[in-house]
Amino acid sequence: MKTRIITALLIIVCVIPPLVYGGWLIDLLIAFFIVAGGIELLNLKEQDTAWPIIIKPLAIAAVFVLVLSDERLHTALLGICALVFLSIPVFTDRFHAKDGFLCIAYITFFFAIARCFLHIYETNRMYVWFIIIATYACDTAAYFCGRFLGRHKLNVRISPKKTWEGSIGGWFFGAVLS
């Protein structure tokens, strides 16, 4: 419990200033999410062979280029990314077509998330606060409902401590508090 509280406080300290002041701080926050998410997602690859060292930085850089580019270039740039990542297996045995598709999925997903976040933020900053409050309400309620009422495991293979009761409690309180 102490770890959860410390983590929550650190997240609050890191997220609130960018949301309040905007500008380059919000760009830095989005950059952090792109890099952290990229590392997490690209590490999902089965470790049968190590990728060439340039792959992960190239995929992360591709997301930044897309986010910062002119909207008219997005389709062409996504096409170039697909071509590049699906061509790499021709030149190395350590990177396969399925790895290329994983990189393309990462680039597309995080580009879309970053664009959506920026659009929501530019439309009305209060929407971002709404999303944060709903997320924390859902997560906190799920934790406590699962801890005190949880009897039926949700999916032990994915997360051994998650319960149906916690999941339903999280959904309910997330909806009520948002």
Regions found by a protein language model. Give the residues of each.
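Membrane-embedded alpha-helical bundles of polytopic integral membrane proteins
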Residues: 1-163, 167-178
